[in-house]
UniProtKB/Swiss-Prot annotation:
Pfam family name, one: L_HMGIC_fpl
Tissues in which the UniProt entry reports expression: Widely expressed. Expressed at high levels in lung, thymus, skeletal muscle, colon and ovary.
Protein name (record): LHFPL tetraspan subfamily member 1 protein
Organism: Homo sapiens (Human)
Keywords, alphabetical: Glycoprotein, Membrane, Signal, Transmembrane, Transmembrane helix
Sites carrying sugar chains: N153
Membrane topology: Multi-pass membrane protein
Compartment annotation: Membrane
Domain of life, source organism: Eukaryota
Similarity section: Belongs to the LHFP family.
InterPro entries: LHFPL
Regions crossing the membrane: 86-106, 122-142, 165-185
Residues in coiled coil: none
Length: 220
């Protein structure tokens, strides 16, 4: 089975898959921010949370120890986190699409040319830039009341208070940086140049097809 990728292209496809899966998995896991509330550990992502308070019997607050997403988009604690959810999600989707095409290029001949590989690298740069923008927007939501309750009521924008950043935040940012810097550069050498013989055969095949259609139309 011939590949449409060079040896560098095969490495590019592998790294593209790794960065896409790393960033996307980190996006969905609620381990971007760690804190505590009512003596229980609490963690957040942009649209998910683990352990949250609810009103129990007698209107007392109790902690529900489970993970889940917010009930609606508007329930996300801050506008900055809402924007982060959309921007980061779009970037992850773009990286996954490019990674899928790159993996298919390892198995299919003539799928990815030199120019196509560079265009896919540009798409990876945009995807990584979107995820990086989401990571940059994330600290803008640390001044919301829900986050302040978890971070000792002393957190603010770009100030964690008693909270700390989680490993998923770093993985998302690291995956985005690798996609922008490494994968984009490798994509310039990923695709094979089309062979002249293949180009001639393709042109002749199309020409013959058009000639047959024209001849069929001209016949009475």
């Amino acid at each position: 089975m011939r590949s449409s990728l060079t040896m560098v292209g095969t490495l590019w496809a592998f790294l593209s898959l790794v960065t896409a899966v790393t960033s996307s998995t980190s996006y969905f896991l609620p381990y971007w921010l760690f804190g505590s509330q009512m003596g229980k550990p609490v963690s957040f992502s942009t649209f998910r949370r683990c352990n949250y308070p609810v009103r129990g019997e007698g209107h007392s607050l109790i902690m529900v120890e489970e993970c889940g997403r917010y009930a609606s988009f508007n329930a996300i604690p801050s506008l900055a986190w809402q924007m982060c959810t959309v921007v980061t999600g779009a970037g992850c989707a773009l990286l996954l699409l490019v990674a899928l095409a790159a993996v298919l290029g390892c198995c299919m001949e003539e799928l990815i040319s030199r120019m196509m590989g560079r265009c896919m690298g540009a798409a990876q740069f945009v995807g990584g830039l979107l995820i990086s923008s989401g990571c940059a927007l994330y600290p803008l939501g640390w001044n919301s009341p829900e986050i302040m309750q978890t971070c000792g009521n002393v957190s603010n924008q770009f100030q964690l208070g008693t909270c700390r950043l989680g490993w998923a935040y770093y993985c998302a940012g690291g995956g985005a940086a690798a996609a922008m810097l490494i994968c984009t550069w490798l994509s310039c050498f990923a695709g094979r140049n089309p062979k002249p013989v293949i180009l001639v055969e393709s042109i002749m095949r199309n020409t013959n097809s058009y000639a047959m259609e024209l001849d069929h139309c001209l016949k009475p």
